[in-house]
Amino acid sequence: MKGKSGTLCQPDRSALLFDTDTRKLPLKKALEFWEESAGSLYDFYIATPESFYTHGRTLCSGKILLNYCVSVEQKLSRSSYRIGMDGFDHYEVQFFLDGMWRRGDGKLEAQAGSGDLIVHDTAQAHAGSASDFTNVTLFVPRFLLAPLLDRPDEQNMRVIGSDNPLVGLLRSHVIGLFRTLPSLDAAQAALMVSPTVELIAATLNGTERQDNSRGVAAAQFNSIRGYIDEHVLDQGLSVEQLAVKFGISLRKLTYLFSREGGVASYIQKRRLHLARQCLRDQRHAHKSIADIGLEHGFLYAPNFTRAFQQTYGMTPRETRAMARRTWLAGERESPSWFYRASRWGL
């Protein structure tokens, strides 16, 4: 896969990557295809595997993928351990056209039916179930969408009803893309990325009405969060320093980051994310676990290991060991999920 400026589409191919109907295949081959595709992200349990089938089409629009899928009742889950193992990190913006999805992690009650919008964040744990279904899903890299969101880390398993006008607008756009992309070449399809991502952001940001005071608070939060993201590895970064920098009280700063578990929690989460990337990158293979922890704000290796394991379900050493298997296979890092998904039809 190319870098952030690249495209998943092949210059000599249309935006349609593949069209698969497993009813034309033996059951074993159908299940193998599902393991390769859905199983690349999720652990799944199919209620009646003997009757399994899926019909799917995947299209490419620059750096994003659009998938149409018909399949049978099943449960899908994505654990913190798996997140730490594969490092995949993107959003799934999904509309159920038929059937129903239900959240299953026990934290919140949420379900979606025909026309409703569901958002999944592959950097966070997932547990859900679906009846026999038809859905359309946009797979969007985090680096494209997160900077445009007011709350980029609060979208996982979020459901917004079909009666919301912005949801209706986005749904019409996505269905229009699905119908139009097969007739476009790679260059034309890539032009649709920016307006699509901006419409997603507008929908997710605009579905909760804010009064003026909440709007000001959101603007303050976004400004401070951006500063933290840019200076997250600075040794002097602290709650007190941020309060002085932005001229607000410690109490107000704590309030702004209450949904993140506090300022210190947000800083640690960002540092752990960067540390995980470093552990998986062969260019940093010469560094010890303790050195990587120190570079990312952890003075003591045991504290780094404990925080990392609590977040990702595995230790830094286990994460590096898994990455090393990939290095030994001659690859610098795990193939991007988008790269793999764009080539299932080849």
Model-predicted segments: where are they?
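Short acidic-hydrophobic surface loop/beta-edge motif
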Residues: 55-61
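Glycine- and acidic-residue-biased ligand/ion/polar-headgroup-sensing regions
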Residues: 62-64, 70-77, 81-102
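Residues within the DNA-recognition helix of helix-turn-helix
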Residues: 256, 307
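Alpha-helical bundle regulatory/interaction domains
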Residues: 2-55, 100-252, 259-265, 279-302, ...
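Short, conserved glycine- and acidic-residue-centered signature motifs
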Residues: 86, 217, 268
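His/acidic/aromatic-lined binding-pocket segments of jelly-roll/cupin-type domains
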Residues: 58, 83-86, 90-95, 110, ...
